[in-house]
Amino acid sequence: MAMMEYLTTRKDELIGWVRKFSIFPYPFVTACCGMEFMAVASTLYDTDRFGAALPRFTPRQSDLLMVVGTITHKEAPVIKRVYDQMCDPKWVMAFGACATSGGVYRNYTVLQGVDRIIPVDIYIPGCPPRPEMVIDAIMKLQDKIAGERHPIFPYEKQNPVPV
C-alpha cells in the first residue's frame, strides 16, 4: 500500500508564495528612464524568471504600478486615477530619481516625488537606475508580498481588535 504524503502550510504562506511569482506590472513611463525600463524588459535581464515579465496595458489587470520618470502636476490626477483603478492588492514602484524626488527637473511644474499623491512600496534611486537595481527591487518586493497577510474574505481585518 502506498504511503500518502501531505503538505501542510499556513494559508498566508501559500497565498504569498503564489502572489510573489505572479506580478503583473503596469508601466507608467513619462521620461528618459523609459529607455532603461526597456532594457529591463529585454531578454538579457529576463524578468520573466521573477514572474514580472508581461506588462499589462490596463490598470484593472495589473497589481504593480511602475512609475517611471518625471511626474508633473498636470499628470498627478491621471496617475492617481490609474492607481485607484487597480484592484487590491496593489503595489507601487518609483523608478528613478525623478519619480522618487523630482530629480534634475526640480521646478514648480514637477511633482517632487510620486509619494505625495499615492503610497509607494519600493524606491529605485538612480538617473537612470541600472537594470540590476530593478531586478533587486523586484526581489525585495517579492519578499514583501510573501510576508503580507492575505485575508480570504474582504471583511476580514488585517489587525483584528479583541472585544
Curated annotation (Swiss-Prot):
PROSITE patterns: COMPLEX1_20K
Domain of life: Bacteria
Cofactor stoichiometry and binding remark: Binds 1 [4Fe-4S] cluster.
Subcellular location: Cell inner membrane
GO molecular function terms noted in the UniProt entry: 4 iron, 4 sulfur cluster binding; iron ion binding; NADH dehydrogenase (ubiquinone) activity; NADH:ubiquinone reductase (non-electrogenic) activity; quinone binding
Reactions catalysed according to its record: a quinone + NADH + 5 H(+)(in) = a quinol + NAD(+) + 4 H(+)(out)
Cell inner membrane as UniProt keyword: yes
Cofactors named for this entry: [4Fe-4S] cluster
Membrane topology: Peripheral membrane protein
UniProt key word Glycosyltransferase: no
A Gene Ontology cellular-component term: respiratory chain complex I
Pfam families in UniProt: Oxidored_q6
Enzyme kind, highest EC tier: translocase
UniProt-annotated binding residues for [4Fe-4S] cluster: 32-33, 98, 127
An individual GO BP term: electron transport coupled proton transport
Protein family: Belongs to the complex I 20 kDa subunit family.
Subunit field text: NDH-1 is composed of 14 different subunits. Subunits NuoB, C, D, E, F, and G constitute the peripheral sector of the complex.
Purpose of the protein: NDH-1 shuttles electrons from NADH, via FMN and iron-sulfur (Fe-S) centers, to quinones in the respiratory chain. Couples the redox reaction to proton translocation (for every two electrons transferred, four hydrogen ions are translocated across the cytoplasmic membrane), and thus conserves the redox energy in a proton gradient.
Family matches, as NCBIfam families: nuoB_fam (TIGR01957), PRK06411.1 (NF005012)
Alphabetized PANTHER family for the sequence: NADH DEHYDROGENASE, NADH DEHYDROGENASE [UBIQUINONE] IRON-SULFUR PROTEIN 7, MITOCHONDRIAL
Protein name, entry field: NADH-quinone oxidoreductase subunit B
Name of encoding gene: nuoB1
